[in-house]
Regions:
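Short Gly/Pro-enriched turn/cap motifs at secondary-structure boundaries
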Residues: 151-154, 178-181, 199-200, 225-233
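A short core secondary-structure module
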Residues: 169, 173-220
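Flexible, small-/acidic-enriched active-site or ligand-binding loops
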Residues: 214-245
Length: 357
């Protein structure tokens, strides 16, 4: 394994930073009163202001035109299919250099769960690809990942949303919760139980459906506010007698769990890059402060206790970064089962969350 950053990856990251500095940052500064004042950013119902949504769309479209928005998507979906290592390092660079910016993450580079050409969409029928993918690729349309429920989070097999076939349609009923981008999405990748017997045995029985969010029977009841804020990005979805055509099944009937993992595992890798970048930014802030703040006639960075704390943080970040690179390398260079990648992903995320803490 050689973790030297390829020249091509460095060029991509530098080009992305130039795009952000020239296109996105000026747009943020021009609209700072809207973007960085919560009472302007959110409406009373917790949803983002329509003007905010318009700005986010403007950035998505510009990123797509510049070639960044789709660069990690599959080639069969119209992306560049750049590898996991480049994806990890790119997310790291964004989080490290542009922390907590309103129009950057996950807008310039979309989340594998929601916006952009997520690998889950490989399972779409060709007719649906022809109809929907162009708008998604261009950043004009966004998605949400309808898996989590009130009683089913990490335990995917605990979902209760059911789909019953009636003639050539599936009638779906249930509730989804903590669904990122649900209040704003144009489409939903919706997971439901289609075979209760297989589902009970945890051997299948879950199917993924492609749904337009303006369909009758699909309702976003409320936005779930982020702690300390007046609104949020996630929502609660009620599904009542939602009728979905047979051809809107993503992938194979009863095999939706595998499709879910396609999005989740990619998402874990991207999240790890964000955790590492955020931790690197936080460490720099700590070092800068330690070199500035003085007690007992010298900077606190000269006190051994503070040095130990900073050193331990640096070691955690170093370990997490190498764990993430190792995982990305294995995904890029070896063939592994979904279960093996799932285990790698969990270990990876644990290490990176520890680094952030």
């Amino acid at each position: 394994m050689n973790f030297t950053v390829p020249e091509e990856t460095l060029e991509i990251i530098n080009g992305l930073k130039q795009f952000i500095d020239k296109k996105v940052i000026p747009l943020e500064e021009e609209n700072a009163g809207l973007l960085y004042n919560e009472r302007n950013y959110y409406l009373e119902n917790g949803r983002r202001h329509p003007k905010v949504e318009s700005l986010r769309k403007e950035v998505r479209v510009a990123s797509a035109e510049a070639g960044f928005y789709t660069m990690f998507g599959d080639k069969e979906l119209g992306g560049e299919e750049l590898g996991p290592i480049t994806a990890l390092l790119t997310q790291e660079a964004i989080a490290k250099n542009y922390p907590n910016r309103k129009l950057i993450d996950p807008i310039v580079i979309p989340s594998p769960f929601t916006n952009g050409i997520t690998p889950v969409l490989r399972g779409l029928k060709q007719e649906l690809k022809d109809e929907y993918l162009d708008g998604i690729r261009k950043g004009e349309k966004t998605l949400c990942f309808g898996l989590t429920e009130p009683d089913a989070g990490s335990d995917v097999w605990g979902i209760k949303t059911k789909a019953v076939k009636v003639n050539n349609e599936w009638v779906i009923n249930g509730t989804k919760q903590w669904i990122t981008n649900a209040p704003y999405a144009d489409y939903c990748m919706l997971f439901a139980v289609t075979n209760p017997e297989l589902h009970a045995k945890r051997k299948g029985g879950i199917t993924c459906f492609f749904v337009e969010t303006n369909s009758t029977g699909f309702n976003v009841d409320s936005v779930i506010p982020v702690m300390g804020e007046l609104g949020g990005d996630a929502g609660i979805i009620s599904i009542e007698q939602l009728r979905v055509p047979e051809e809107n099944i993503i992938g194979e009937l009863d095999q939706g769990f595998t499709k879910a993992m396609h999005g989740i595992n990619n998402g874990r890798l991207g999240m790890s890059g964000k955790c590492i970048g955020s931790a690197q930014w936080a460490l720099k802030q700590a070092i800068d402060y330690a070199n500035m703040r003085k007690t007992f006639g010298k900077t606190i960075g000269e006190h051994q206790t503070i040095q130990n704390m900073i050193a331990e943080s640096a070691m955690d970040i170093y370990a997490a970064r190498n764990m993430a690179l190792h995982c990305a390398w294995k995904i890029e260079n070896t063939k592994k089962t979904t279960g093996e990648r799932n285990l790698d992903g969990k270990s990876l995320l644990y290490g990176n969350v520890r680094a952030c803490i």
